[in-house]
């Protein structure tokens, strides 16, 4: 295994942050914690329901970690949407992370997907059954065009996760494969479209700006994620099917050349994002800029990405890139380093246990299916 290219990573990260003019001022600390807890609380109650617990079959610790990660991503990045929209998006994107971490073969449950869809029957695949049940709560925030993007991109994501289960990096010479798979499983159009709730944006009046933003966000969001994930995935055997490593196989190039390819694409996309929208509708530009800055803050502060290890390693070094990286990291930590103990409570497992006890206490239940129905509408917040 090669040594991690720390100096190269520092230089790339610094250039990215400079290009997007990173300065996350999306929230005060109190506002950040308030939004985190609001979104978490609603989502935790959603996933604690008996139906979700029964169909998802996810280890409680993993589900808890997944929800905390996603709530952080949504609250930090979707800084301009309502708290209710943040909560509903947090539920939706937690479902996607659960699927991404799954190793179950989807083939048997997808045999009659379209026939069931056309007939209005519940999907055989449990993930689709739950996602479809929650989708109206997400789509109520958006107009028809953005909603269509959310639906289509989620469908693409499912297919991308299906492909990833084969751990296939592409055939040598298949240069289109890495980007094909990354666009499929990147949720870029879902993310890009979910920035524009109808209560804040006139979808028809800003149709061209929104369409362009979705197009630009598709690559920017996934490439930044791939770049910021490169350290944690570098020597992790479970993360060997990544865009960079697929470039190595399909393009028949070295790891350094593949990283350089990703770097140049990410920096170019960042320049485009700023240049294209700087002269457009101010509210559109503000939303995009807040997303970019919050998205970077989330990556720098979320322990899933382990970038604190890079910071500790280079802190005190006198190189220009090390000093700039540390300054950016500290800037992000000052606004975004919030302990989950301040907002991620109560735990999902605790809520699920309470619900299980309540169900067991029900008397004279004539139909077992009744107790499998959601006890809480996912559009209600439980304080």
Curated annotation (Swiss-Prot):
Record EC number: 4.2.3.6
Q: Which GO terms describe its biological process?
A: sesquiterpenoid biosynthetic process
Which pathway is it part of?
Sesquiterpene biosynthesis; trichothecene biosynthesis
Can you provide one Gene Ontology molecular function annotated for this UniProt record?
trichodiene synthase activity
Substrates-to-products reaction catalysed? (2E,6E)-farnesyl diphosphate = trichodiene + diphosphate
Keyword list, A-Z: Lyase
Please give the start and end residues of each transmembrane region: none
Superkingdom is Eukaryota
Enzyme class label? lyase
Q: What does this protein do?
A: TS is a member of the terpene cyclase group of enzymes. It catalyzes the isomerization and cyclization of farnesyl pyro-phosphate to form trichodiene, the first cyclic intermediate in the biosynthetic pathway for trichothecenes. It serves to branch trichothecene biosynthesis from the isoprenoid pathway.
Family in the record: Belongs to the trichodiene synthase family.
Other information: Trichothecenes are sesquiterpenoid toxins that act by inhibiting protein biosynthesis.
Q: What is this protein called?
A: Trichodiene synthase
Q: What lineage is this protein's organism placed in?
A: Eukaryota, Fungi, Dikarya, Ascomycota, Pezizomycotina
Gene this chain is encoded by: TRI5
